């Protein structure tokens, strides 16, 4: 249906558009982790899905501690929602890690990237030429690899990302500026 409408260059119509946007927001909330998707399909319960995603995030934290006993990688990871919320042009490492050497920061970012839990987007001065020759290793943004985990990480300070928050996000009724959720 979507292909036919797209190929014919006709609008979806309000009803189909609303459903597609709701499905997209549902994907942003649940994410694509197989355990979270499976839990949502089985229970249709956001609390249980949130518990699954928190377990995954806890496993990530355990792995980060194995890589970096100082906890700096965990701090960089946990600060991703706050950094994206700032709407800055780059991740400001100095606001997360004080007195950290640039070479140490590059090493931490490389470890985080190698963990496959984040995507690093580097600033490039001239993207038309080869990206690797123009990327600025000191100017970057970090994004979580799974949008559902990002949603849970955003509300990590609460014991449970309440069903009411999920429902409001799903129905576009949450008053906060959550553009950074879409950016991730």
Where are the regions a protein language model picked out?
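Amphipathic alpha-helical "lid/sensor" segments that cap RecA-like P-loop NTPase cores
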Residues: 6-58
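Accessory nucleic acid-recognition modules appended to NTPase machines
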Residues: 38-184
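Conserved small helical "lid"/interfacial subdomain of P-loop NTPases
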Residues: 1-5
